[in-house]
């Protein structure tokens, strides 16, 4: 059970960092190319 908790915390932390970097830069590729 502890392995599940540690993997969940690791994935959630990586997801938060990824979204922070993604939303910091303007996503011009997704918005301009419709």
UniProtKB/Swiss-Prot annotation:
Secretion signal, residue range per the UniProt entry: none
Function: Found at the monomer-monomer interface of the photosystem II (PS II) dimer, plays a role in assembly and dimerization of PSII. PSII is a light-driven water plastoquinone oxidoreductase, using light energy to abstract electrons from H(2)O, generating a proton gradient subsequently used for ATP formation.
Primary residence: plastid
SUPFAM superfamilies: Photosystem II reaction center protein T, PsbT
Family of the protein in this entry: Belongs to the PsbT family.
Protein name in the entry: Photosystem II reaction center protein T
Domain of life: Eukaryota
Disulfide pattern: none
Family annotation (PANTHER family): PHOTOSYSTEM II REACTION CENTER PROTEIN T (PTHR36411:SF2), PTHR36411
Gene designation per UniProt: psbT
Spans through the membrane: 3-23
Keyword Thylakoid set for record: yes
GO terms of biological process kind: photosynthesis
Any matching Pfam family: PsbT
Membrane topology of the entry: Single-pass membrane protein
Gene Ontology CC terms: chloroplast thylakoid membrane; photosystem II reaction center
InterPro entries attached to this UniProt entry: PSII_PsbT (IPR001743), PSII_PsbT_sf (IPR037268)
Subcellular localization: Plastid, Chloroplast thylakoid membrane
Endoplasmic reticulum recorded as keyword: no
């Amino acid at each position: 059970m502890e392995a599940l908790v540690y993997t969940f915390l690791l994935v959630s932390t990586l997801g938060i960092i990824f979204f922070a970097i993604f939303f910091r830069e303007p996503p011009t590729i997704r918005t301009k190319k419709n």
